[in-house]
Amino acid sequence: SGPCGPCSEIYYDRGEKYGNGPEDVMGGEGDRFMEVWNIVFSQFNNDGNGNYTDLVQKNIDTGMGLERLAVAVQDVGSIFDVDTLKSLRDLICSLAGGIGYEQPGSYDSDVSVRICTDHARAMTFMISDGIMPSNNGRGYVLRRIIRRAVRHGRKLGIQGSFLPTLAENVIETSKDGYPELEEKRDFILNVVRAEEEKFEKTYEQGMDILAQMEQELEKAGNKELSGEDAFKLYDTYGFPLDNTKEILEEKGFTVDEDGFNAAMKKQREQAR
């Protein structure tokens, strides 16, 4: 419901070196054509029931992907190769023992490298904007980002505290355009360090408990973790639900989300 209208996408042809197969068409799954701009001609209001009326004031809503444009201008493979992110990506590979990136057989580690890269920048800017890790709202989004980055760092073999090092890189590479990062450097690093250490205290134990739960599911021929067990991981070991889901999905399991939400609701009612 709300303002809407026809839309148009602008694609950039990156050339045959990025693909020349049947999937390499505008709007396809290939890498050759990259959408860099989206335009919506807002001229109708949808009442939510499929009824459209003309807007009194029509407008054009447009948005360009800045780093997608950088991908095109710098002629690189993805946003993780542009100058604003490459040094952070390379730092993560170095901390992981000098692993290769986009090498034969490196798909799984590439995913973890990209997640750590993306999440490190996101957490740094969120904290700079005054968002603090918590169990509610934006604060919980930040907490989930940090904890997911920790997990993927461990998947890469990075041991010990590493997120403050990544935040330092983000600050150094972005401070010219965002001077507030330098002004809040110590604050950002202290928040990241404290949140990482807090999760570290329960992470390994929680992973062991989850592994035991997986074994029990295998023995029972069950592919779904109960909501109660997922809530235990959240409540006792600090595992966000999406973290647990991601770990289990990698191994072919699912989570009873309705059961998790019911357990969460029950605890909140008891706490009143």
Summary of predicted features, one role per range:
Residues 1-272:
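A glycine- and charged-residue-rich anion-binding loop/surface
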